[in-house]
């Protein structure tokens, strides 16, 4: 599971997830990519689950890049605990996703196989996504 090795602070405030993705919105490593068209949060488990679906479908062919990293801690108080007494412990880590963010990239496979693999991966994610190709500059 992905999570930071160390952080400056253990817990974070909830904050807002506004705007569009400026960084990480272009296909920069692979040939094809899975791009988010919605806003939301991806947990480390969801990122790993989609990665497994991708790698299993392409088998040994192709190289895969994960372009998102869960760096935001989400805390939760235990069940049946009264309010107050401080913020709960960190339960899991999430990556905040804005529309236009590239989530996964792949290269070394045909477009048809890439589309199938990304369809399987997208089914594991709670966001609406789209398939994009690299544009030659």
UniProtKB/Swiss-Prot annotation:
GO cellular component, one term: cytosolic large ribosomal subunit
A Pfam cross-reference name: Ribosomal_L16
Keyword rRNA-binding part of the UniProt annotation: yes
Gene3D superfamilies linked to this entry: Ribosomal protein L10e/L16
Region Disordered: start-end pairs: 1-20
Protein's GO biological process: translation
Listed Basic residues bias regions: 1-13
CDD domains: Ribosomal_L16_L10e (cd01433)
Keyword RNA-binding belongs to the record: yes
Listed InterPro entries: Ribosomal_uL16, Ribosomal_uL16_bact-type, Ribosomal_uL16_CS, Ribosomal_uL16_dom, Ribosomal_uL16_sf
Assigned protein family: Belongs to the universal ribosomal protein uL16 family.
Subunit structure: Part of the 50S ribosomal subunit.
Listed name of the protein: Large ribosomal subunit protein uL16
Lineage: Bacteria, Pseudomonadati, Pseudomonadota, Gammaproteobacteria, Pseudomonadales
Gene name of the record: rplP
């Amino acid at each position: 599971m992905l999570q930071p090795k160390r952080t400056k602070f253990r817990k974070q405030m909830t904050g807002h997830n506004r705007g569009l993705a400026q960084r990480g919105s272009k296909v920069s490593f692979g040939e094809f990519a899975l791009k988010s068209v919605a806003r939301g949060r991806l947990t480390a488990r969801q990122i790993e689950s989609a990665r497994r679906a991708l790698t299993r479908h392409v088998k040994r062919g192709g190289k895969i890049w994960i372009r998102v990293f869960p760096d935001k801690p989400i805390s939760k108080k235990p069940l049946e605990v009264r309010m107050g007494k401080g913020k709960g412990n960190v339960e899991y880590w999430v990556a905040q996703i804005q529309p236009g963010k590239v989530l996964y990239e792949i290269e070394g496979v045909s477009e048809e196989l890439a589309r199938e693999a990304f369809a399987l991966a997208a089914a594991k994610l709670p966001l609406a996504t789209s398939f994009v190709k690299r544009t030659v500059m």
